[in-house]
Amino acid sequence: WFAQRRNFSTYNIINGICKDNRIGEYYNNPSFGYGGYCLPKDTKALAGEYGDSCILPAIIRSNDLRKKNIIEHLISLDKKIRIYKLNMKMESDNMRGSATYDILRQLEKRGIFVAVYDKMCEKMQFKECIKLVNTIEELDSNCDIIIANRMYKELKKISYKVFTRDIYG
């Protein structure tokens, strides 16, 4: 959010940080916030165990704030929003704890119409403002912005519409 508001290149910032050998470039690709089915639960458990004496509560608040800022930014754009897949990691068949899923649910709570392309959602129940689509062409049709936690090959031809934090996709 800091870099986005100042028009800084996230790619250049990350690459600069990765030059430090203690950090490296192996696992440093931002997303809409950390998630998944283990990390959020484990982070909260550790924060509960060690309380305010450690940095973990600040990390949890920062992650929640990151998603909140992304949601507010998307709403402020006043665009027709689509979401490509709700999973946290590429090739995963699980969306538990996904930041993209959290973003969808917040948009849904506000009654914002969103079309979603994700085969895993076929049996899920959503409010009227959420529509499931079956093809990339349907996803692309009549939309301004496509939210994608990761840049998939399927999205390359419409990448100019994709809103992602994936700097290597």
Descriptions of predicted regions:
Residues W1-G169:
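Structural/interface elements that position substrates and couple domains in central-metabolism enzymes
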